[in-house]
Amino acid sequence: MILLIDVGNTNIVLGIHDNEKYIASWRISTDSKKTSDEYSIQVMQLFNQAKLNPEDVEGIIISSVVPNIMHSLENMVRKCFCKEPIVVGPGIKTGINIKYDNPKEVGADRIVNAVAAFEKHKKPMIIIDFGTATTFCAITEKGDYLGGNICPGIQISADALFERAAKLPRIELEKPKSVICKNTVTSMQAGIIYGYIGKVEYIVKRMKKEMMDLGEKEPFVLATGGLAKLVYSETDVIDEVDRKLTLEGLKILYEKNKE
Protein backbone atom coordinates (compact mmCIF):
# COMPACT_ATOMS: atom_id res chain seq x y z
CA MET A 1 0.00 0.00 0.00
CA ILE A 2 1.49 3.34 -1.12
CA LEU A 3 0.59 6.76 0.31
CA LEU A 4 0.71 9.55 -2.29
CA ILE A 5 0.73 13.16 -1.05
CA ASP A 6 0.24 16.12 -3.39
CA VAL A 7 0.66 19.48 -1.64
CA GLY A 8 -0.89 22.40 -3.48
CA ASN A 9 -1.21 26.04 -2.47
CA THR A 10 -4.83 25.59 -1.38
CA ASN A 11 -5.31 21.86 -0.71
CA ILE A 12 -3.35 18.73 0.09
CA VAL A 13 -4.55 15.62 -1.74
CA LEU A 14 -3.72 12.24 -0.22
CA GLY A 15 -4.25 9.01 -2.12
CA ILE A 16 -3.83 5.35 -1.23
CA HIS A 17 -2.77 3.00 -4.03
CA ASP A 18 -2.92 -0.74 -3.45
CA ASN A 19 -3.01 -3.73 -5.81
CA GLU A 20 -3.01 -1.57 -8.96
CA LYS A 21 -5.97 0.58 -7.88
CA TYR A 22 -6.85 3.56 -5.72
CA ILE A 23 -8.68 2.52 -2.59
CA ALA A 24 -8.99 5.92 -0.89
CA SER A 25 -8.33 9.61 -1.44
CA TRP A 26 -8.83 12.70 0.68
CA ARG A 27 -8.52 16.47 0.30
CA ILE A 28 -7.51 18.63 3.27
CA SER A 29 -6.61 22.32 3.55
CA THR A 30 -3.00 23.39 3.14
CA ASP A 31 -1.95 25.16 6.34
CA SER A 32 1.71 25.94 6.91
CA LYS A 33 0.94 26.89 10.53
CA LYS A 34 -0.05 23.33 11.44
CA THR A 35 2.48 21.28 13.35
CA SER A 36 3.51 17.73 12.50
CA ASP A 37 1.41 16.57 15.48
CA GLU A 38 -1.69 18.27 14.10
CA TYR A 39 -1.16 16.71 10.67
CA SER A 40 -0.52 13.34 12.33
CA ILE A 41 -3.86 13.49 14.16
CA GLN A 42 -5.68 14.48 10.98
CA VAL A 43 -4.11 11.77 8.83
CA MET A 44 -4.67 9.05 11.44
CA GLN A 45 -8.34 10.05 11.68
CA LEU A 46 -8.66 9.66 7.91
CA PHE A 47 -7.05 6.21 8.07
CA ASN A 48 -9.35 5.17 10.92
CA GLN A 49 -12.47 6.36 9.09
CA ALA A 50 -11.43 4.37 6.01
CA LYS A 51 -10.57 1.33 8.19
CA LEU A 52 -6.99 1.32 6.89
CA ASN A 53 -4.00 0.17 8.92
CA PRO A 54 -1.02 2.60 8.84
CA GLU A 55 1.31 -0.39 9.27
CA ASP A 56 0.27 -1.61 5.81
CA VAL A 57 1.81 1.47 4.15
CA GLU A 58 4.97 0.29 2.37
CA GLY A 59 6.11 3.67 1.10
CA ILE A 60 5.27 7.35 0.84
CA ILE A 61 5.99 9.97 -1.82
CA ILE A 62 5.38 13.72 -1.48
CA SER A 63 5.13 16.43 -4.13
CA SER A 64 4.87 20.00 -2.84
CA VAL A 65 4.73 23.54 -4.18
CA VAL A 66 4.70 24.92 -0.60
CA PRO A 67 8.27 24.62 0.77
CA ASN A 68 7.53 25.84 4.30
CA ILE A 69 5.08 23.01 4.96
CA MET A 70 7.53 20.21 4.20
CA HIS A 71 9.17 20.02 7.63
CA SER A 72 5.81 19.31 9.29
CA LEU A 73 4.71 16.81 6.64
CA GLU A 74 7.96 14.86 6.60
CA ASN A 75 7.88 14.62 10.40
CA MET A 76 4.24 13.53 10.23
CA VAL A 77 5.23 10.70 7.89
CA ARG A 78 8.00 9.57 10.24
CA LYS A 79 5.68 9.63 13.26
CA CYS A 80 2.72 7.90 11.63
CA PHE A 81 4.43 5.41 9.32
CA CYS A 82 8.02 5.10 10.63
CA LYS A 83 9.36 5.62 7.11
CA GLU A 84 11.31 8.22 5.15
CA PRO A 85 9.23 9.70 2.32
CA ILE A 86 10.47 10.14 -1.23
CA VAL A 87 10.26 13.86 -2.02
CA VAL A 88 9.85 15.04 -5.61
CA GLY A 89 12.70 17.44 -6.36
CA PRO A 90 16.19 17.77 -7.83
CA GLY A 91 17.90 14.41 -8.31
CA ILE A 92 14.74 12.32 -8.54
CA LYS A 93 14.48 9.89 -11.48
CA THR A 94 11.71 11.04 -13.81
CA GLY A 95 12.19 9.34 -17.18
CA ILE A 96 11.76 12.67 -18.97
CA ASN A 97 14.35 15.19 -20.18
CA ILE A 98 13.72 18.62 -18.66
CA LYS A 99 14.74 21.34 -21.15
CA TYR A 100 14.17 24.28 -18.79
CA ASP A 101 16.98 26.86 -18.51
CA ASN A 102 17.29 25.83 -14.86
CA PRO A 103 15.59 22.45 -14.30
CA LYS A 104 15.51 23.10 -10.53
CA GLU A 105 12.99 25.88 -11.13
CA VAL A 106 10.31 23.55 -12.51
CA GLY A 107 7.57 23.06 -9.93
CA ALA A 108 7.15 19.58 -8.50
CA ASP A 109 3.50 19.53 -9.59
CA ARG A 110 4.47 20.20 -13.21
CA ILE A 111 7.08 17.43 -13.18
CA VAL A 112 4.64 14.93 -11.68
CA ASN A 113 1.95 15.74 -14.25
CA ALA A 114 4.44 15.55 -17.12
CA VAL A 115 5.70 12.14 -15.99
CA ALA A 116 2.17 10.74 -15.76
CA ALA A 117 1.10 12.17 -19.11
CA PHE A 118 4.18 10.91 -20.95
CA GLU A 119 4.07 7.42 -19.40
CA LYS A 120 0.37 7.02 -20.18
CA HIS A 121 0.22 8.52 -23.68
CA LYS A 122 3.73 8.57 -25.28
CA LYS A 123 2.84 11.37 -27.70
CA PRO A 124 3.34 15.15 -28.03
CA MET A 125 1.22 16.74 -25.33
CA ILE A 126 0.06 19.95 -23.75
CA ILE A 127 -0.87 19.48 -20.09
CA ILE A 128 -3.09 22.03 -18.37
CA ASP A 129 -3.44 21.95 -14.59
CA PHE A 130 -6.26 24.13 -13.27
CA GLY A 131 -5.08 24.74 -9.72
CA THR A 132 -4.57 27.85 -7.60
CA ALA A 133 -2.36 28.85 -10.52
CA THR A 134 -3.07 27.40 -13.95
CA THR A 135 -0.03 25.81 -15.59
CA PHE A 136 0.53 24.81 -19.22
CA CYS A 137 3.33 22.34 -20.03
CA ALA A 138 4.66 21.04 -23.36
CA ILE A 139 6.01 17.49 -23.77
CA THR A 140 7.47 16.06 -26.98
CA GLU A 141 6.91 12.57 -28.33
CA LYS A 142 10.41 11.62 -27.10
CA GLY A 143 9.67 12.80 -23.57
CA ASP A 144 11.39 16.19 -23.64
CA TYR A 145 9.82 18.67 -21.24
CA LEU A 146 10.04 21.87 -23.30
CA GLY A 147 8.60 24.24 -20.71
CA GLY A 148 5.32 26.11 -20.66
CA ASN A 149 3.66 28.99 -18.88
CA ILE A 150 1.91 29.91 -15.65
CA CYS A 151 -1.07 32.21 -15.17
CA PRO A 152 -3.42 33.09 -12.30
CA GLY A 153 -6.08 30.49 -11.59
CA ILE A 154 -9.77 31.22 -12.08
CA GLN A 155 -10.37 31.68 -8.34
CA ILE A 156 -7.43 34.10 -8.04
CA SER A 157 -8.90 36.13 -10.91
CA ALA A 158 -12.29 36.24 -9.18
CA ASP A 159 -10.75 37.20 -5.83
CA ALA A 160 -8.68 39.97 -7.43
CA LEU A 161 -11.76 41.47 -9.07
CA PHE A 162 -13.60 41.52 -5.73
CA GLU A 163 -10.64 42.92 -3.79
CA ARG A 164 -9.62 45.64 -6.25
CA ALA A 165 -13.04 46.88 -7.44
CA ALA A 166 -14.91 48.49 -4.54
CA LYS A 167 -18.47 48.02 -5.79
CA LEU A 168 -18.16 44.44 -7.03
CA PRO A 169 -19.28 41.58 -4.75
CA ARG A 170 -17.58 38.28 -4.03
CA ILE A 171 -19.21 35.65 -6.25
CA GLU A 172 -19.54 31.90 -6.69
CA LEU A 173 -17.81 30.49 -9.76
CA GLU A 174 -20.90 29.32 -11.61
CA LYS A 175 -21.30 29.29 -15.38
CA PRO A 176 -24.03 31.68 -16.63
CA LYS A 177 -26.06 30.75 -19.68
CA SER A 178 -25.07 33.85 -21.64
CA VAL A 179 -22.21 36.30 -21.99
CA ILE A 180 -24.74 39.11 -22.38
CA CYS A 181 -25.79 39.44 -18.76
CA LYS A 182 -28.36 41.63 -17.02
CA ASN A 183 -27.02 41.82 -13.46
CA THR A 184 -23.67 42.35 -11.77
CA VAL A 185 -23.17 38.82 -10.44
CA THR A 186 -23.76 37.00 -13.74
CA SER A 187 -21.78 39.69 -15.58
CA MET A 188 -18.78 38.95 -13.36
CA GLN A 189 -19.28 35.19 -13.70
CA ALA A 190 -19.42 35.45 -17.50
CA GLY A 191 -16.38 37.69 -17.70
CA ILE A 192 -14.29 35.50 -15.42
CA ILE A 193 -15.29 32.07 -16.73
CA TYR A 194 -15.74 32.72 -20.45
CA GLY A 195 -12.81 35.13 -20.48
CA TYR A 196 -10.71 32.44 -18.88
CA ILE A 197 -11.80 29.88 -21.46
CA GLY A 198 -10.78 32.31 -24.20
CA LYS A 199 -7.35 32.63 -22.60
CA VAL A 200 -6.97 28.85 -22.47
CA GLU A 201 -7.96 28.51 -26.12
CA TYR A 202 -5.44 31.13 -27.26
CA ILE A 203 -2.56 29.71 -25.21
CA VAL A 204 -3.25 26.18 -26.48
CA LYS A 205 -3.43 27.43 -30.07
CA ARG A 206 -0.11 29.27 -29.68
CA MET A 207 1.61 26.32 -27.96
CA LYS A 208 0.43 23.90 -30.65
CA LYS A 209 1.85 26.13 -33.38
CA GLU A 210 5.21 26.50 -31.63
CA MET A 211 5.48 22.75 -31.01
CA MET A 212 4.53 21.86 -34.58
CA ASP A 213 7.06 24.42 -35.86
CA LEU A 214 9.65 22.30 -34.02
CA GLY A 215 8.56 19.25 -36.01
CA GLU A 216 6.17 17.68 -33.50
CA LYS A 217 2.84 16.18 -34.52
CA GLU A 218 -0.26 18.04 -33.36
CA PRO A 219 -0.17 17.77 -29.55
CA PHE A 220 -2.80 15.97 -27.51
CA VAL A 221 -4.26 18.31 -24.87
CA LEU A 222 -4.80 16.83 -21.41
CA ALA A 223 -6.35 18.75 -18.51
CA THR A 224 -6.45 18.11 -14.79
CA GLY A 225 -7.27 20.06 -11.63
CA GLY A 226 -10.42 21.21 -9.87
CA LEU A 227 -11.98 23.29 -12.66
CA ALA A 228 -10.84 21.16 -15.61
CA LYS A 229 -14.31 19.74 -16.28
CA LEU A 230 -15.90 23.19 -16.25
CA VAL A 231 -13.51 24.47 -18.92
CA TYR A 232 -13.66 21.19 -20.87
CA SER A 233 -17.45 21.48 -21.15
CA GLU A 234 -17.14 24.84 -22.93
CA THR A 235 -14.26 24.33 -25.36
CA ASP A 236 -13.07 21.89 -28.00
CA VAL A 237 -9.33 22.51 -27.48
CA ILE A 238 -9.08 20.03 -24.57
CA ASP A 239 -9.02 16.39 -25.66
CA GLU A 240 -9.33 14.71 -22.26
CA VAL A 241 -9.70 15.40 -18.54
CA ASP A 242 -7.78 13.21 -16.10
CA ARG A 243 -8.63 14.11 -12.49
CA LYS A 244 -6.13 11.59 -11.07
CA LEU A 245 -3.19 12.63 -13.26
CA THR A 246 -1.08 13.96 -10.38
CA LEU A 247 -1.66 10.90 -8.20
CA GLU A 248 -0.79 8.69 -11.18
CA GLY A 249 2.43 10.63 -11.64
CA LEU A 250 3.33 10.22 -7.97
CA LYS A 251 2.76 6.47 -8.19
CA ILE A 252 5.00 6.24 -11.30
CA LEU A 253 7.73 8.30 -9.62
CA TYR A 254 7.53 6.15 -6.51
CA GLU A 255 8.13 3.02 -8.58
CA LYS A 256 11.07 4.67 -10.38
CA ASN A 257 12.74 5.80 -7.15
CA LYS A 258 11.97 3.21 -4.47
CA GLU A 259 14.98 1.29 -3.19
Swiss-Prot record:
EC number(s) reported in the record: 2.7.1.33
UniProt-listed GO biological process terms: coenzyme A biosynthetic process
Predominant localisation class: cytoplasm
Which co-factors does it depend on? NH4(+); K(+)
The UniProt record gives the binding positions of substrate as: 100, 107-110, 184
User: What broad class of enzyme is this?
Assistant: transferase
Cellular location of this protein?
Cytoplasm
Cofactor comment: A monovalent cation. Ammonium or potassium.
Q: Which cysteines are joined by disulfide bonds?
A: none
Catalytic activity from the UniProt record: (R)-pantothenate + ATP = (R)-4'-phosphopantothenate + ADP + H(+)
Location of the active site: 109
User: What keywords tag this UniProt record?
Assistant: ATP-binding, Coenzyme A biosynthesis, Cytoplasm, Kinase, Metal-binding, Nucleotide-binding, Potassium, Transferase
Query: What Pfam families has UniProt attached to this entry?
Result: Pan_kinase
Taxonomically, which superkingdom? Answer: Bacteria
* A single cellular component GO annotation: cytoplasm
**Pathway info:** Cofactor biosynthesis; coenzyme A biosynthesis; CoA from (R)-pantothenate: step 1/5
Quaternary context = Homodimer.
Q: Which family does it belong to?
A: Belongs to the type III pantothenate kinase family.
PANTHER family, alphabetized: TYPE III PANTOTHENATE KINASE (PTHR34265:SF1)
Identification of the protein by name: Type III pantothenate kinase
Organism encoding this protein: Clostridium perfringens (strain 13 / Type A)
